[in-house]
């Protein structure tokens, strides 16, 4: 049991116990003489850790100066006090097994874990009438459950050639187990992109919240009568009710009230991968060595906000200052209506700032992380040169990836678990290459 104290919180002290138990079955009589099995160990562990990552003096309110019209200075509350902050607590249970056979040539490690994070420290968005945009508080509970497998093997080993391989598979499901608000949903505070994410009780971390894009308004749809939720025509056209013209973006009016507003929003995607894997291989043939490492992330969405920004910069028909996008060539026109790209229309309402399914893409990808080729000079040659060792190698990092995502790099969107999967001008992971040699002299 450990006790941690922090002057950053009102409740300074918190206690965090931990315990672990393992049973090495290989040491038991019924397996000790088994030559096929090298290792068989069962593990059980529990641990609790805390988090107090808030800035110093955050429990106190903060004043900021305001310049008055008469030249005097007054002060306002810029940040409210957070006097009741306490430790965020993370409790985790882990069950695992270690297994090895064939004199260590094949090894398996498997783990199941259940992690519960309570009293999460979060900046939560506040309504306008509160006088400040956000409030730091302990709010909600997050649960992460997952499994991890690692298989290591030496498939071929002899005097001249050997191959070692490691394969890792992982699945994690992070959900909001509890959101203590009347509707069990909460908006994160912070920058504009955080408005894309909602913390919804029972839903996964990284859930996108927005509107459902339904294509482009066509001339006949604009002029068609509006049908309300009861299936009745109101006598007005869709164009009149929604304030649109042909060529504008169309969004689904969920409650059929004739308005596109927050009541029509819903879950439109999730940036949390369902599973990921990594495969590392190293080969040695005489004095040559070759290795590569490849990873994959699957079953998640990316919100391509970079693409949305490009479209959103267009005001009416003004495109000055905008780098032309190839998509513009496919925009709606009266003679080109079979498209999902809005037209340069004069009039109507183009809701450019809407987060919607229009910019949600499949983010799954496979990426080659590294490739290395090397050669080690033979011992006799090194002695002739008066050195003990010389290895020359070339290495490439992140040379390519395979994905259907239209942005630059899907891996660059994988940030914080709470706000993952959004490409807001994300800088791609760098491609690098290196040529070098290692020398050890006597």
Residue locations for each model-derived region?
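Single conserved hydrophobic/aromatic residue that forms the stacking wall/gate
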Residues: 433, 440-442
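Amphipathic, heptad-repeat alpha-helical segments used for oligomerization and assembly
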Residues: 258, 262, 267-271, 353-363
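Extracytoplasmic gating/loop element in the C-terminal half of outer-membrane beta-barrel translocons
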Residues: 4, 243, 297-391, 396
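Glycine-rich, aromatic-lined ligand/substrate-binding cores of catalytic
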Residues: 271-302
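Conserved active-site-proximal loop/helix segments of enzymes involved in bacterial cell-wall
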Residues: 123-125, 260-262, 308-310
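Active-site-adjacent bridging/hinge elements
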Residues: 1, 69-73, 122-125, 252-258, ...
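Extracellular/periplasmic, surface-exposed regions of secreted and cell-surface proteins
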Residues: 1-201, 355-435
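Conserved small-residue
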Residues: 137, 154-269, 330-333, 397, ...
């Amino acid at each position: 049991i450990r006790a941690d104290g922090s002057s950053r919180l009102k409740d300074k002290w918190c206690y965090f116990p931990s315990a672990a138990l393992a049973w090495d079955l290989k040491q038991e009589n019924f397996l000790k003489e088994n030559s096929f099995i090298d290792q068989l160990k069962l593990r059980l562990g529990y641990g609790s850790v805390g988090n107090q990552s808030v800035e110093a003096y955050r429990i106190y309110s903060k004043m900021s100066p305001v310049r008055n019209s008469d030249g005097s200075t007054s002060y306002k509350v810029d940040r409210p006090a957070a006097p009741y902050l306490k430790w965020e607590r993370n409790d985790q249970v882990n069950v695992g097994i270690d297994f090895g056979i064939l004199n260590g040539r094949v090894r398996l490690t498997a783990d199941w874990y259940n992690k519960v994070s309570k009293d999460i420290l979060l900046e939560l968005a506040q309504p306008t009438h509160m006088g400040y945009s956000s409030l730091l508080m302990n709010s909600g509970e997050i649960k992460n459950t997952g499994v991890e497998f690692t298989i290591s093997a030496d498939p071929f080993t002899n005097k001249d050639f050997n191959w070692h391989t490691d394969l890792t598979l992982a699945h994690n499901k992070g959900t909001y187990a509890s959101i203590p608000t009347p509707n069990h949903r909460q908006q994160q505070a912070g920058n504009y992109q955080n408005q894309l994410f909602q913390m919804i009780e029972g839903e996964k971390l990284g859930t996108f919240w927005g509107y459902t894009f339904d294509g482009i308004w066509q001339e006949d749809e604009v002029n068609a009568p509006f049908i309300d939720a009861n299936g009745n025509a109101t006598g007005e056209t869709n164009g009149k009710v929604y304030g649109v013209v042909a060529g504008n973006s169309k969004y689904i009016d969920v409650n059929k009230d004739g308005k596109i507003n927050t009541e029509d929003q819903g879950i439109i995607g999730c940036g949390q991968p369902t599973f990921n894997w990594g495969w590392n291989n190293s080969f040695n043939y005489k004095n040559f060595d070759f290795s590569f490492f490849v990873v994959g992330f699957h079953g998640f969405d990316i919100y391509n906000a970079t693409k949305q920004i490009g479209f959103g910069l267009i005001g009416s028909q003004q495109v000055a200052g905008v780098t032309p996008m190839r998509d513009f060539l496919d925009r709606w026109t009266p003679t080109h209506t079979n498209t999902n790209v809005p037209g340069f229309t004069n009039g109507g309402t183009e809701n450019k700032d809407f987060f919607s399914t229009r910019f949600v893409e499949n983010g799954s990808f496979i990426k080659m992380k590294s490739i290395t080729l090397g050669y080690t000079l033979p011992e006799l040659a090194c002695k002739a040169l008066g050195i003990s060792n010389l290895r020359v190698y070339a290495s490439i990092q992140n040379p390519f990836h395979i994905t259907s995502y239209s942005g630059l790099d899907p891996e660059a969107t994988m940030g914080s678990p709470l706000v993952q999967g959004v490409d807001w001008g994300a800088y791609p992971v760098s491609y690098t290459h290196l040529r070098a040699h290692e020398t050890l002299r006597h």
